[in-house]
Each structure stands twice: as C-alpha cells, then as structure tokens.
C-alpha cells in the first residue's frame, strides 16, 4: 500500500514537472507587440523600438531581488548603451492608488534614482506585457533583437552562481 502511494505521488510529481517545463518553454525569436507608458508619460511601443537591440528588465520596487537586479541593469546600461543597446526597467506595479500593488510614477522615479538607475522606467501595471513575454517570476530580463524578436526566453529569478551577467552579455554580444 505504501508502495502504491509512493508511485502515485511520483507520477503526480512527474506530471507537474512536465507541465511546468511546458509552460516555461517560450519560443526564441518570438515577436511580441506591446505598448508601455513611461513614468514621464511617453508611450514606448514595439514598433518604435524596431532597429534597436532592447533590454526589458521586469521588476517591482517592493521586491528585494529587484533592488539587486537594478545593480546589474545599471552596469548593463553603462556598458552597452554606447554600443546601440537600449535598456528599460519595467515596473509591474499598479498605477491604481486603490491597489495593494500601487506605486506612483514619482515613487518609481525616486526608486530608480535612489539606486542610481539612469534608464527610462516603464509601467506594465496589469502584467499583460510580461505575460506576453513568458515572464513568470520577478525580476526577469527579456532581450529583443533589432527586429523586435525575443533573443531566447526570459532570464530571471535568483542568480546563485553569479552567471546572469555572463548570460546577458553573451546574448547581447551575439546581437551586436
């Protein structure tokens, strides 16, 4: 009886893992149409970015990992902005003051300034754009080629090996 229970649990775990792996596989070179508003009121669209290599760093100001991510985003922007790469930090926080996940434009600009981020801050307040890119955890980074296609899937979460910067640099260097 214990053996049957173990087999059932194991089978259930295998199905769960297979399901998770399926959802995690976002096709590379996928073009995603999107429109995001900056904290300065500009609208940035996928069409307006055509011809640019773009880094979209998704995060939230309340999330400690996003604060860590900002250090890497800042370094990435410093290193690649003069090489034709445009970097944006995309907040997933709501612009609705009634939301538990609320952050005003001013709060987001102050947050970016506090952490030395000198890139445009965009808003994905309903999470629709991050979902289109297959972002399933924060923080995550998506890289777009000059045609607006995703260069590989999203890169995100914890980086215990410290290899994230190398992965991003490798993807960007291939696109340049």
Regions found by a protein language model. Give the residues of each.
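Bacterial N-terminal signal peptides that target proteins for export
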Residues: 2-13
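Short active-site neighborhood of thiol/selenol oxidoreductases, capturing the structured segment around
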Residues: 46-67
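Structural microenvironment flanking redox-active thiols in thiol-disulfide oxidoreductases
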Residues: 67-114, 125-131
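Structural micro-motif
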Residues: 116-120, 134-142
């Amino acid at each position: 009886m214990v053996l049957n229970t173990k087999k059932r649990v194991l089978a259930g775990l295998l199905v769960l893992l297979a399901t998770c792996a399926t959802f995690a596989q976002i096709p590379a070179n996928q073009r995603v149409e999107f429109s995001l508003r900056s904290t300065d009121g500009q609208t940035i669209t996928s069409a307006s970015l055509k011809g640019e290599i773009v880094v979209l760093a998704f995060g939230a100001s309340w999330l400690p990992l996003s604060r860590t991510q900002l250090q890497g985003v800042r370094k990435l922007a410093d290193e690649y902005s003069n090489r034709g790469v445009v970097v944006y930090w995309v907040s997933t926080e709501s612009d609705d003051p009634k939301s538990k996940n609320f952050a005003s434009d001013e709060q987001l600009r102050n947050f970016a300034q506090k952490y030395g981020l000198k890139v445009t801050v965009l808003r994905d307040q309903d999470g629709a754009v991050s979902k289109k890119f297959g972002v399933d955890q924060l923080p995550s980074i998506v890289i777009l080629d000059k045609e607006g296609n995703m260069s590989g899937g999203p890169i995100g979460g914890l980086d215990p090996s410290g290899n994230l910067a190398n992965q991003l640099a490798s993807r960007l260097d291939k696109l340049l």
